From Swiss-Prot:
It comes from Homo sapiens (Human). The gene is SNRPC. Belongs to the U1 small nuclear ribonucleoprotein C family. Component of the spliceosomal U1 snRNP, which is essential for recognition of the pre-mRNA 5' splice-site and the subsequent assembly of the spliceosome. SNRPC/U1-C is directly involved in initial 5' splice-site recognition for both constitutive and regulated alternative splicing. The interaction with the 5' splice-site seems to precede base-pairing between the pre-mRNA and the U1 snRNA. Stimulates commitment or early (E) complex formation by stabilizing the base pairing of the 5' end of the U1 snRNA and the 5' splice-site region. Changing residue 24 to Q: Abolishes the binding to U1 snRNP. One of its GO terms (molecular function) is zinc ion binding. One of its GO terms (biological process) is mRNA 5'-splice site recognition. Residues 63-92 have a biased composition (Pro residues). The lineage of its organism: Eukaryota, Metazoa, Chordata, Craniata, Vertebrata. This is U1 small nuclear ribonucleoprotein C. The keyword S-adenosyl-L-methionine does not apply. It is found in: Nucleus. Keywords: Acetylation, Metal-binding, Nucleus, Phosphoprotein, Ribonucleoprotein, RNA-binding, Zinc, Zinc-finger.
Amino acid sequence: MPKFYCDYCDTYLTHDSPSVRKTHCSGRKHKENVKDYYQKWMEEQAQSLIDKTTAAFQQGKIPPTPFSAPPPAGAMIPPPPSLPGPPRPGMMPAPHMGGPPMMPMMGPPPPGMMPVGPAPGMRPPMGGHMPMMPGPPMMRPPARPMMVPTRPGMTRPDR
């Protein structure tokens, strides 16, 4: 009868039966070995990505970012389209949307941020306070369960 070899633990089990494998795979040392294996694997993947990116940058395949170096003397960098600024040639200045004037140097809130207080022209809700916004946005669960990759030598996944 063939023995079962666990690549994570680098050991043979006494015999190849589902109960022995299940007991082994639920053990503390096996779980630590699996965790260590995948931790090392992730570190190797990250280092590989860093090395590839560095090599591509040194070969000139990746251009430097536009704001990595200071602009040349006398150069004016236009503001991004989402930020207020003086109108550019050929552009009409944006009219204000009928609300109260903005505080100087404040500007509208960034996209995705809610202003504090009621909207212009709206009264606060009954009770006198605004409802609290929930904490950080929740991530939705993946569309299907994620599968843990198996290594060579592991004949069947744990159940």
